[in-house]
Amino acid sequence: MSNSSARPESLGEYLAHLPLSDEQRAELASCTSFSELHQRLAANPAASSAEAVQASVGPRLTVGSAAELEEAEMLGVDGSGRLCLKIAPPIKRTKVVPEPWRTNVLIRMWRRMTGRPNAPQPPKRELPPARWRTVGSIRRYILLALMIGQTIVAGWYMKGILPYQGWSFVDFDEIVNQPLWDTVVQVWPYALQTSILILFGILFCWVSAGFWTALMGFLELLTGRDKYKISGSSAGNEPIAPEARTALVMPICNEDVPRVFAGLRATFESVAASGNLDRFDFFVLSDTNDTDIAVAEQQAWLDVCRETKGFGRIFYRRRRRRVKRKSGNLDDFCRRWGGEYKYMVVLDADSVMSGECLSSLVRLMEANPDAGIIQTGPKASGMDTLYARMQQFATRVYGPLFTAGLHFWQLGESHYWGHNAIIRMKPFIEHCALAPLPGKGAFAGAILSHDFVEAALMRRAGWGVWIAYDLPGSYEELPPNLLDELKRDRRWCHGNLMNFRLFLVKGMHPVHRAVFLTGVMSYLSAPLWFLFLVLSTALLATNTLMEPQYFIEPYQLYPLWPQWHPEKAVALFSTTIVLLFLPKLLSVILIWAKGAVEYGGRVKVTLSMLMEMLFSMLLAPVRMIFHTRFVLAAFLGWAATWNSPQRDDDSTPWGEAVRRHGPQTLLGIAWAALVAWLNPSFLWWLAPIVGSLVLSIPVSVISSRTRLGLAAKDEKLFLIPEEYATPQELLATDQYTHENRWHALHDGFVRAVVDPRQNALACAMATARHGQAAPIEALRAERVAKAIEVGPKGLDLNTRLALLSDPVALSRLHEQVWAEHNAAWIDVWRASINNDPHSPLLPLHPENAGQPSLVGA
């Protein structure tokens, strides 16, 4: 540690970034070294240089704001006597033990046959008998019958459309004795047709399931007579019992910090306005490994606590061991603090929830002691690109039908989507911890899509899982453009394929086995559809290029003509169109019946629906190709990158669109040319597919433009109720986001090293509390020396993370940078301040006058 004399200009610059009085600054300006400066700040002239800089963390942090932090009882000391901020409650550990997966049914059968018992499972309760369970089973049998019956009829029509009718004209005795090529020529058309028919049946059944779900949702919402809806079980606004403590947890990882803490603040203030704030605690659970973002999170946490007086109510924790991604983050919370709460509400990084919605969820849990999870139906809002606004419109208009329909078929054995839901803590801790999947390869290891699995485990343990589809006040955001949505889809695709390994796990309820199956089909339907189109093209080539055999038997008097029944083709095509698009029409009819003013009026909502239908037709083949790639990548073991999704209105550059969509465009051109060469008349049937692929680049770019989205909004196109009459929570989120961006902290790690107050905050919030053992001290010295030598631009991520987590090393690096006036660090810090003049040089905050507040609203 350097003890060289301090340059007067360096000392003056350092003191300028501490909110001191003129007298204090003049007194400290007489220091001859930074060691002396820290000794005076710490009021300990006998302290060594290393001890002084650590001891000065408290004065540097609290100068000008000591009363505020002391009043909130936020200051404490660790086991070594170092000052720290109480950013989380005291740890009260609860045992969280995941049950190992036994996914191989053959091994279980073999162990049973050989008299070796399987490992015992944790004790589970039986869900008490209830009428809804019987009703749900009957409804699901009806759904299965409707799907299968509809598919059989459609398959029969499809069989009649195909040119080669059955295998009766294939002589299998002759096949044995004839040359192989003749066998291929004879069998090939029938094999193609059989494959096409099988694929058609699978895909039609999948479409049929969606149709019947939407239809029943339409009837539920139109009549409003759902006697089994979970939201009807609460008495209303009864007081929440003191023991019904609820933790709102927001797992984040390298997110958009201004938006995250804006939504958190809006939610906090809405809960305060509801009068139930004393029943809720808020936890930001960070898995961030970008040190700049991590420092910005620390500052944002301090800001939001000061602005809302949320000290002791809003907590922050950043993990250093990032195991099992989001589910591991939740496990860590449950292990440390879960036993202190009766319920947990999981929020996504873009989630916003009203205080009334959260209070209603707690009341519903209290009124339904057999409910383990209650999922809300979050409304998408807040984005302005044309693509996002069309998707917001689609989810807002069509989504309620499908959500209500899911509830109709599933009742208390339903979905959980991982956020905007309330969970009963005790059974979740005991039964829903996720062990890694056994084995090796792409489908082994930590579970990626945890939500469906946790819902299945909750139901297996004897607790209900419900969707409160009609509960208002739950919001989320969607990706701003097609490519960002597809990046998210790749993660979800891999996760859903992994989850299917649990299909045969013992004890899973049949409904949740079906949920695993539908999760797989959400993505597997894409390669099946693509294969269906490829085989159809191959059948066209067969009919065009292969010489037809009109006489296949000796002495045959009449030729066997390939058959074509256009009336059946038209009927089947019309039926498929009805299944695909009738739910959208029913959604608009429902809006007409309930009132269309909030959607721009009847004419505008109808026009928006037609435009969205055209847009979805354009994008369906593009998604098909991408999802096919994702499925193949998962099976080939290509890793899916789990980066945080885009949270703002970024448009797609032309260069990126060409890179991502270029192969699809070439495929569309080649496919169209092939079909035109084979049979130009067939090109009309394939035009929606190949045309969409050819146009994918401009459609992707143009739809990502915010200007077009706002222009459509001005014309009341794709309008949703949250835009027509924006809820106070969303208004506050939008304003706080703009304010946070204005004061956003950039180059956070450099500031945590150089800036006097930012360094004090980072040291006080550091989580590594190691002692003074020789190996630890040697490692600290090595890291500090490396940081001084290579500067901020040459420092690797692991060293950055280690320094940010260690208050001792970080404070020593801070002292040494200033003592040596290290230009590599200080110049970057100065440049950051000059380039970003609106970010806080210190953790100081503007007056809150004029800012929207939900407290007392």
Curated annotation (Swiss-Prot):
Its UniProt pathway annotation is: Glycan metabolism; osmoregulated periplasmic glucan (OPG) biosynthesis
Main location, first listed in the record:
membrane
Fetch the Gene3D superfamilies from UniProt.
Spore Coat Polysaccharide Biosynthesis Protein SpsA, Chain A (3.90.550.10)
What is the superkingdom listed in this entry's lineage? Bacteria
GO terms for molecular function, please? hexosyltransferase activity
| Gene Ontology BP term (one) | glucan biosynthetic process
* Subcellular location per the Swiss-Prot or TrEMBL entry: Cell inner membrane
Q: Which UniProt keywords apply?
A: Cell inner membrane, Cell membrane, Glycosyltransferase, Membrane, Transferase, Transmembrane, Transmembrane helix
| Transmembrane domains' residue ranges | 141-158, 197-219, 514-536, 570-592, 605-627, 681-703
> InterPro entries, per this entry?
Glucans_biosynth_gluTrFase_H (IPR023725), Glyco_trans_2-like (IPR001173), Glycosyltr_2/OpgH_subfam (IPR050321), Nucleotide-diphossugar_trans (IPR029044)
* Membrane topology field: Multi-pass membrane protein
Enzyme Commission number(s): 2.4.1.-
Which Pfam families is this protein grouped with? Glycos_transf_2
Query: Would the keyword Metal-binding be found if you checked this record's keyword annotation?
Result: no
**Which cellular component, as a GO term, is one annotated location?**
plasma membrane
Functionally, this protein is described as follows:
Involved in the biosynthesis of osmoregulated periplasmic glucans (OPGs).
Q: State the family it belongs to.
A: Belongs to the glycosyltransferase 2 family. OpgH subfamily.
Put simply, this protein is called Glucans biosynthesis glucosyltransferase H
What is the source species? Pseudomonas putida (strain ATCC 47054 / DSM 6125 / CFBP 8728 / NCIMB 11950 / KT2440)
**Gene name for this UniProt entry:** opgH
